[in-house]
Amino acid sequence: MSSSKPVTPRNDRRQNSGRRHSHRSSGIQLPSMSPKVHHYPIDAENLPMDSPEIVEKFASLAESMETLDLHMHDLCHIHDHISNQFNESFASFLYGLSMTMWCVDFPGCPSREQWEALISKRERKERIEVLKKRLADAQKLNDRLKLRLSDEAKQKPQQLTSQQRPTHGPTRQIKQQPRSVNFNTHSSDSISTNSYTSGDFNTNRRVSRIPQPSRSNLPSSRFQAPSKSGPNLNQPPRYMRGLFDGNNTLNTSNYSRIKKPIHNRSVNNLQNRPPFR
């Protein structure tokens, strides 16, 4: 059976390739079929892959490949030993530990001294912030106290000037001297009463602006009037004395002989009184 596919002539391909090679070897520049693509000029002395940047990149890539090959060889060696010489649970633990050891890397991890220095620096910053806040609060309190002190200093002179103004002259209270009444009797069986004092029963005290003379020269026999708030319970029994004598008779014969009370009240001399103002 004959194939339905046409046979590709091989001779033509060889001839075309040879012709193309012959054209290039002759130095003839073929026109570019894609004018948008930039082609480097062919220079035997300055090739694009021989530039220093490309050479450095290839050197770094070669070193990385060597390191990767070494790590993979060591990892395969560790995996083989763990899988063949340990049990399954412990082998899985060591396998995960080895994977973590090989895969996780912290090149920028700080040391212990650097970490402690970082923590102390952070604490110093926080302390500085707290001190700044306390200083601001103290400054505000100081300003408020200064303002309050200035207000009080302004109010004090006004109070002093108002207190220094004379309102009225000094007032003195007049104390009325009590009157002493003596009832003297001649006979022993008659009604006799001791001296009693009667003061002014007016509860309203008078206030005078006239300065009064000194009362230090009053006789010592006079004593102060009893209290106005209640009765005088220290009075002698005047009313019941003589009612019940030896003969149980009421003796009223001596009432006619009662003398008038003698007023020992000293009369103030008008000449000693200061002039009226």
From Swiss-Prot:
Location of the protein in the cell: Nucleus; Cytoplasm, Cytoskeleton, Spindle; Chromosome, Centromere, Kinetochore
Bridged cysteine pairs (disulfide): none
Gene Ontology CC, one term: mitotic spindle pole body
Superkingdom to which the source organism belongs: Eukaryota
Region Disordered: start-end pairs: 1-36, 147-242
Skewed-composition ranges (Low complexity): 185-198
Gene Ontology biological process: attachment of spindle microtubules to kinetochore; cell division; filamentous growth; mitotic sister chromatid biorientation; mitotic spindle organization; protein transport along microtubule to mitotic spindle pole body
Regions annotated as coiled coil: 119-156
Xref: InterPro entries: DASH_Dam1
Phenotype upon loss of function: Kinetochore declustering. Short mitotic spindle and an apparent absence of interpolar and cytoplasmic microtubules. Cell cycle arrest in mitosis with unseparated DNA. Inviable.
Keyword annotations from UniProtKB, A to Z: Cell cycle, Cell division, Centromere, Chromosome, Chromosome partition, Coiled coil, Cytoplasm, Cytoskeleton, Kinetochore, Microtubule, Mitosis, Nucleus
Compositional bias ranges of the Polar residues kind: 156-166, 173-184, 199-235
Family: Belongs to the DASH complex DAM1 family.
Job of this protein: Component of the DASH complex that connects microtubules with kinetochores and couples microtubule depolymerisation to chromosome movement; it is involved in retrieving kinetochores to the spindle poles before their re-orientation on the spindle in early mitosis and allows microtubule depolymerization to pull chromosomes apart and resist detachment during anaphase.
Name of the protein in question: DASH complex subunit DAM1
Lineage start: Eukaryota, Fungi, Dikarya, Ascomycota, Saccharomycotina
